[in-house]
UniProtKB/Swiss-Prot annotation:
Species for this entry: Methanocaldococcus jannaschii (strain ATCC 43067 / DSM 2661 / JAL-1 / JCM 10045 / NBRC 100440) (Methanococcus jannaschii)
Domain of life: Archaea
Entries under InterPro entries matching the protein: Erg6_SMT_methyltransf, Methyltransf_11, SAM-dependent_MTases_sf
Protein name: Uncharacterized protein MJ1233
GO molecular function: methyltransferase activity; S-adenosylmethionine-dependent methyltransferase activity
Length: 288
């Protein structure tokens, strides 16, 4: 269990930003450089003689900006005067996708819904499904970029979040929308939720939010054994939200939500219901 502090001093460049700079006819341009997390605009000086754009965090050549302009699928950032791609190639390919707010993509699979809703709206649907309240203790089993943990914390909950993949944790450190994760108020545990959950005491949490990778990637997090552990760590009356995915889609001919609901009931959960807008299931640990 750790508290990680982080200070983000980066300028972010997307294809759109690069195009605006290259197409500008002025010697300076004011643009948002924090992926629209705020409305703040920064001054960028354009030196056509030297073919560079002077950002607050460093100079970027026109050649690099032209490459970024053609790459609509990635986010780039300037740190300590150098330009980096917000992507990691290590046991797979991990990248931040320039949605607002960003989502994370692992080997071509996006970890948030980005079509019907944006990642922030997706998060609100999950949090609202279990009505997180001030003073409650919340376990977020699969951190990702931490939007769920952050929203629960903003509502006054004590939050512990688990992330298995160090690459995901590194991308969260780059993402400005994840900054609140690293300010010390949210506890982060690096490990597999299947194992980490066994460390917690009986009846420790008011709420568990379980948003695992898809079944084909993390079947053990959909198992009856794992659901028993969730049931154990929840207080009587405690609530679970379990993201499952689109109920209209089936994995190898099986209705995943139906199977999840059956296993949750089998381990003792009651009031097990589908939550269509959040593409998941809610359940309650009985008080008796």
């Amino acid at each position: 269990m750790s508290k990680i502090t982080l200070v983000l001093t980066m300028n972010y460049i997307t294809s759109k930003i690069a195009k605006e700079i290259l197409n500008s006819q002025s010697e300076e341009i004011f643009l948002n450089l924090d992926l629209n997390k705020t409305e703040k605009k920064e001054k960028i000086l354009i030196d056509r003689e030297k073919k560079i754009a002077k950002f607050p965090e460093g100079d970027v050549s026109f050649d690099i900006l032209k490459k970024i302009a053609k790459d609509e699928g990635h986010i780039y950032f300037i740190k300590d005067g150098e330009v980096f791609k917000a992507a990691i190639s290590n046991n797979g390919y991990y990248k931040l996708v320039p949605t607002i707010p960003p989502t994370i993509e692992i080997n071509g699979i996006r970890m948030h819904r980005t079509k019907e809703v944006n990642p922030y709206e997706d998060t609100l649907n999950k949090i609202n499904a279990v009505k997180v309240k001030k003073g409650e203790k919340v376990l977020d089993t699969c951190m990702g970029l931490g939007y769920t943990a952050i929203e629960a914390y903003r509502r006054g909950a004590e939050v512990i979040t688990i992330e298995k993949n160090p690459n995901v944790l590194e991308l969260a450190k780059i993402n400005p929308y994840s900054e609140e994760l690293f300010k010390g108020g949210i506890k982060i545990i690096l490990g597999d939720a299947y194992d980490v959950i066994k460390r917690f005491k009986d009846e420790e949490f008011d709420v568990v939010i379980h948003d695992p990778p898809r079944f084909s990637l993390a079947g053990h997090l959909y198992s009856e054994e794992f659901y028993k552990e969730i049931f154990r760590v929840l207080k009587p009356g405690g609530r679970l939200f379990h993201y499952v995915g689109n109920p209209g889609k089936k994995y190898r001919g099986k209705d995943l939500q139906k199977g999840v609901m059956e296993r949750l009931r089998k381990v003792g959960f009651v009031n097990v219901k589908r939550v269509e807008e959040a593409l998941g299931v809610v359940a309650v640990k009985p008080r008796d």
